[in-house]
Amino acid sequence: HLVTTGTYSCPDGFPDILAQYRAEDYKIDQEYRNFYYEYDQLEDTEAFERLRDLVENIYTNEYLDKLLPKWNAGLQEEDSLTKLPVQIDFYAHNIRNARERTVVIISDAMRYEVGQELFRLLSDDPKCTAKLETQLSVLPSYTRLGMAALLPHKQITMTDDYQVLVDDVLCDNLAGRQNVLQKHLSNSICVQFDDIKGLKKN
């Protein structure tokens, strides 16, 4: 996919850009990530530096340089935010009315292409029913703001020094996010992955 990206063509208009990305273009990001994963496993990279430079040149100049200007222009279209569910509505659409126990796993910088790979792996498990959906993240795409957007809220604000407040509660750490969540769902908890990983199985 990265080599064929040398002839990459990006459509015009936000709906068509989204459709092409979900159908095909995510594979470019996926292969780019896989390439660097394998490259970083090498003890001696000298023999592969020209290949790395080629991959980087194609990815940056033939793919991103064509995609990003049209993506940014698409976001300026009057109805662009109606083309996808938005991250800021995540709780209202997915959690508020859930009847069963729900676990939300948050991973920093988990792009659609990673989700697509996880979806494929889960779909291969006969005990699992997997579904993949897309959402448009908050802008700016800032980790603390993104995590806050997943919480129940009436308003989210960011201070001049980039502190994120959810309904006037500071949410710059796990305790702050749990405080907000428990105001809406008292029987809920926020935990770090490492704390769960360290638990012993009973």
Tell where the protein language model's regions lie, with residue ranges.
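…; additionally, a secondary subgroup of soluble metalloenzymes is captured
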Residues: 1-102, 109-202
